Amino acid sequence: MTNIRKTHPLMKILNNAFIDLPTPSSISSWWNFGSLLGLCLIMQILTGLFLAMHYTPDTSTAFSSVAHICRDVNYGWFIRYLHANGASMFFICLYAHIGRGLYYGSYMFQETWNIGVLLLLTVMATAFVGYVLPWGQMSFWGATVITNLLSAIPYIGTTLVEWIWGGFSVDKATLTRFFAFHFILPFIITALAAVHLLFLHETGSNNPTGIPSNMDMIPFHPYYTIKDILGALLLILTLLALTLFTPDLLGDPDNYTPANPLNTPAHIKPEWYFLFAYAILRSIPNKLGGVLALLLSILILIFIPMLQTSKQRSMMFRPFSQLLFWTLIADLLTLTWIGAQPVEHPYIIVGQLASILYFLLILVLMPMVGLIENKLLKW
């Protein structure tokens, strides 16, 4: 008798995706982050669902409903902090996953890469609208500042902002629609993730060498299921440590003050995972220019496959490209630090230099070094 997992229409799909999937034998722990992102998504949807049962998307009760969740609901504080810190873990895994793709040339699978960029944008949108929901000071002012950036669009900007707000300022209508967006977007992310996997399984996984590994494949189960379980345990351990010992480490104290349109916080800043983009936005003194730089800082990922000049796919055997890659990582960490600092000397100039270096590395230096490496190898 043939195994049910190979004949049943539904089981067959799962079998081909997670059990009998031929996988390169040499993929390292950097390939764990895809499954960890799936785990993060499931955790966020589940904790979010339980939070939504007790939350009220209304300006007069939103803040107190979050306080009620933390004080009166059984393990409400735990669910709330799992959800908040789960978002941070999500972005850590996301950035590691993208970094892996950049380093090993996984972006050459263009459909998978483009769906991935779309996923990144959707997750960022979800995190942004979610941050508004507790209706603290930073929620309110973050929403005001970021949505107001759209007013930089010529001609239709102001109308567009008022349309998104549902009035002339961030108010009840804004909170209600942001809650609706925050509820629906994770399901759109789930659908996109399925398409992402579909395209990946058309080509098969890349590997650290960047060389086709069709002659050296092993089944996904048990080899990589056990490896993914180890990664999942480490992720859960880190998340639990963060949630139970320092739940507010990555949050902003201003968000424990109820939203007040009459009182602006001294330093308006987003959550840590948006700080690099926020630093790029602030480094340009022109509003429209800043918005364009902010957009380009993320959308530049779409152009990465077109900027590939090296004859080698992976950076594994390219020491000069490796140097530039780690310079880019250091630059992004610098931008993240600058985004959290006030707008004053010397942070302004450091932010501007780091922003220039970011675009220079991706658009000019890395493609140039790829060509130089080809010459050195006489290719």
UniProtKB/Swiss-Prot annotation:
The keyword Cell division does not apply. Binds 2 heme b groups non-covalently. Heme b b562 binds at H83, H182. InterPro entries: Cyt_b/b6_C, Cyt_b/b6_C_sf, Cyt_b/b6_N, Cytb/b6-like_sf, Cytochrome_b, Cytochrome_b_C_euk/bac, Cytochrome_b_N_euk/bac, Di-haem_cyt_TM. The chain crosses the membrane at residues 33-53, 77-98, 113-133, 178-198, 226-246, 288-308, 320-340, 347-367. Gene3D superfamilies: Cytochrome Bc1 Complex, Chain C. Heme b b566 binds at H97, H196. One of its GO terms (molecular function) is metal ion binding. A ubiquinone binds at H201. CDD domains: cytochrome_b_C, Cytochrome_b_N. One of its GO terms (biological process) is mitochondrial electron transport, ubiquinol to cytochrome c. It is found in: Mitochondrion inner membrane. It is a multi-pass membrane protein. GO terms for cellular component: mitochondrial inner membrane; respiratory chain complex III. Heme 1 (or BL or b562) is low-potential and absorbs at about 562 nm, and heme 2 (or BH or b566) is high-potential and absorbs at about 566 nm. Component of the ubiquinol-cytochrome c reductase complex (complex III or cytochrome b-c1 complex) that is part of the mitochondrial respiratory chain. The b-c1 complex mediates electron transfer from ubiquinol to cytochrome c. Contributes to the generation of a proton gradient across the mitochondrial membrane that is then used for ATP synthesis. The cytochrome bc1 complex contains 11 subunits: 3 respiratory subunits (MT-CYB, CYC1 and UQCRFS1), 2 core proteins (UQCRC1 and UQCRC2) and 6 low-molecular weight proteins (UQCRH/QCR6, UQCRB/QCR7, UQCRQ/QCR8, UQCR10/QCR9, UQCR11/QCR10 and a cleavage product of UQCRFS1). This cytochrome bc1 complex then forms a dimer. PANTHER family: CYTOCHROME B (PTHR19271:SF16). This is Cytochrome b. The lineage of its organism: Eukaryota, Metazoa, Chordata, Craniata, Vertebrata. The gene is MT-CYB.
